[in-house]
């Protein structure tokens, strides 16, 4: 099965190990992974900030880059959700609406692809410790991916998965929200970390690097002994 990787900006710039883990995991499960080098930002930051014209140019480049892909897989619920919004954004555009629909139809978040397309729940991973899972707002509310990550994590050998209190509560990142509304964002992430501590977790696992950047950065600043991991790293682990 041929899979085209959409790596996302945050992974490309800050979390390259997540991209590598994603490729290794997919290849181990029998996929042939390629990386269209013409890909760019999905356009979400610009679009959400009101720069619609500029965002659309990035979106058009994404549609060109992945035109020949069979499946587009990304280790980001937020960016996958944005690609799924392209048909709405380009509705009525005679040149781009059809392309937007094609890209949206073949785009999957990583755990969604593993469970719904490959029909795999046990990927043979092992990681010893106590973990809790944070689901991002976009992944849950826009993309609708809720159970797939948990079903995969439940099969990780040696991992004790415990519920996160108020799991669906925002971590306070929200893209530019964390910049424009810094004091509020800080209170939100502090509350999230408090819930992680309630779970007495060794690991905080998530599927969106924006959330992990926000939560992990605050954990580091506070000096908390909690390791933050992307779910791709966990599913590719052999500890």
Swiss-Prot record:
Entry superkingdom: Bacteria
GO annotation terms (biological process): lactate metabolic process
GO molecular function, one term: oxidoreductase activity
Pfam families: CCG
Gene Ontology CC annotation, any one: cytosol
InterPro entries listed in its UniProt record: Cys_rich_dom, LutA
Function: Is involved in L-lactate degradation and allows cells to grow with lactate as the sole carbon source.
PANTHER family the record matches: LACTATE UTILIZATION PROTEIN A, UNCHARACTERIZED PROTEIN YKGE
Family, as annotated: Belongs to the LutA/YkgE family.
Protein name, entry field: Lactate utilization protein A
């Amino acid at each position: 099965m041929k899979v085209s990787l959409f790596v996302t900006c945050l992974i490309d710039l800050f979390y390259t190990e997540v991209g590598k883990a994603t490729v290794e995991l997919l290849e181990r499960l029998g996929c042939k992974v390629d990386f269209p080098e013409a890909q760019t930002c999905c356009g979400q930051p610009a679009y959400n900030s009101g720069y619609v014209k500029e965002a659309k140019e990035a979106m058009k480049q994404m549609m060109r880059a992945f035109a020949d892909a069979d499946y587009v897989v990304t280790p980001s619920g937020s960016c996958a959700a944005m690609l799924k919004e392209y048909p709405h954004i380009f509705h009525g555009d005679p040149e781009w609406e059809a392309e937007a629909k094609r890209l949206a139809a073949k785009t999957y978040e990583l755990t969604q692809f593993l469970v719904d397309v490959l029909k795999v729940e046990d990927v043979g991973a092992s990681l010893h410790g106590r973990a809790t899972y944070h689901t991002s707002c976009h992944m849950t509310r826009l993309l609708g991916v809720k159970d797939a990550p948990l079903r995969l994590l439940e099969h990780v050998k040696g991992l004790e998965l415990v519920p996160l209190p108020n799991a669906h509560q925002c971590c306070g990142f929200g893209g530019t929200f964390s910049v424009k509304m810094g004091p509020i964002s800080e209170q939100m992430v502090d509350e999230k970390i408090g819930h992680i501590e309630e779970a007495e977790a060794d690991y905080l696992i998530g599927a969106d690097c924006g959330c992990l950047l926000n939560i992990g950065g605050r954990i580091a600043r506070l000096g908390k002994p909690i390791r933050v991991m992307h779910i791709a790293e966990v599913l590719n682990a052999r500890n």
